[in-house]
Amino acid sequence: MDRLGSFSNDPSDKPPCRGCSSYLTEPYIKCAECGPPPFFLCLQCFTRGFEYKKHQSDHTYEIMTSDFPVLDPSWTAQEEMALLEAVMDCGFGNWQDVANQMCTKTKEECEKHYMKHFINNPLFASTLLNLKQAEAAKAADTAIPFHSADDPPRPAFDSLLSRDMAGYMPARADFIEEFDNYAEWDLRDIDFVEDDSDILHALKMAVVDIYHSRLKERQRRKKIIRDHGLVNLRKFRLMERRYPKEVQDLYETMRRFARIVGPVEHDKFIESHALEFELRREIKRLQEYRTAGITNFCSARTYDHLKKTREEERLKRTMLSEVLQYIQDSSACQQWLRRQADIDSGLSPSVLMASNSGRRSAPPLNLTGLPGTEKLNEKEKELCQVVRLVPGAYLEYKSALLNECHKQGGLRLAQARALIKIDVNKTRKIYDFLIREGYITKA
């Protein structure tokens, strides 16, 4: 390897002659008894019998030349090194420039020789890299979790979503209009010249320092927006709604302090209080069971069912107070009585209102050209058309419900309605669809 390492075409890559300090050209002499470091001499110094310190002219020597084959009888070692250097300089596959740099071989010969001896050569099949790959192949394959990542939103210019995102451009990671957008105007007339007085020079430097502080404030605001995920305001609000009302109030209060702490610390603080609220509510529920003398969850389910029944009976007993407000209007009173009769017969109020309104149902939504349509399968497209929900909003609602389901180990309809504040009928259809397709599970 030492011998091959000295076969470079560039004379400056070789060690100089110890006698005349000139660059060595092949053939040259290497002393077999001196070294390390190796002792090299050019032919002129060798023929003069040059001696230096411990080196004597009668030492055994070795003639260094690359005029011998290594891998192919028609290729010398010097040509092998020249080929590797040319591939390194010109790039793999650029065989015409490789041949031009070598000057002794055609591009076909260079490509054939390189592919045969350096790519497909079985001699290099037992390299350290291949051995590591073989050892890794013996190990059992482990599943790598894959989470699909949504592309950053790219709303059309001057659209509602673009205005909600403050003109943020995801491809450039920047805003169309910067914070303090006209800060550079204060510098447009400043010019440092040698004739400035000390006071004028200090004044100009103060203006530049103020400009730097404004730039720092601009970058600080950008960092807060990116770190806390405030670019997509709709998604941010959707994530906020997954908390109970009490935690949402705390979230709103603590939002102004988010810039002081990091995003992870802020989220941990909110999550810890959300967990505290859930624990307090669960403790209160268990205390209610204990007050009622219940000691197991089987009896607790019966207690909840009976409690719900009592609440429904209490509402029915108060219906008389409701009908009194319609007593002066006979048509309104008749309509109320029919509605109560239908409710008693098992019809839901939503079905009743739809049948009594007499209005035609809205036509299916046309999804052509709407952003996010290509990310939906056929069943999801049909759902969005029937529910009249744009694909972008559906994908956000779906992502929020999936995250909450994975976090809680299941999802109830009441939780879904608290999470996405839209029409309850649409929420029910989305919830039933995700349950039916296996995206989420019931709690």
From Swiss-Prot:
Keywords: Chromosome, DNA-binding, Isopeptide bond, Metal-binding, Nucleus, Phosphoprotein, Transcription, Transcription regulation, Ubl conjugation, Zinc, Zinc-finger
Residues at which Zn(2+) 1 binds: C17, C20, C42, C45
A single BP term in Gene Ontology: regulation of transcription by RNA polymerase II
UniProt name for this protein: Transcriptional adapter 2-alpha
GO cellular component: a single term: mitotic spindle
Alphabetical list of PANTHER family matching this protein: TRANSCRIPTIONAL ADAPTER 2-ALPHA (PTHR12374:SF20), TRANSCRIPTIONAL ADAPTOR 2 ADA2 -RELATED (PTHR12374)
Cross-link (Glycyl lysine isopeptide (Lys-Gly) (interchain with G-Cter in SUMO2)): K132, K138
GO MF annotation terms: DNA binding; transcription coactivator activity; zinc ion binding
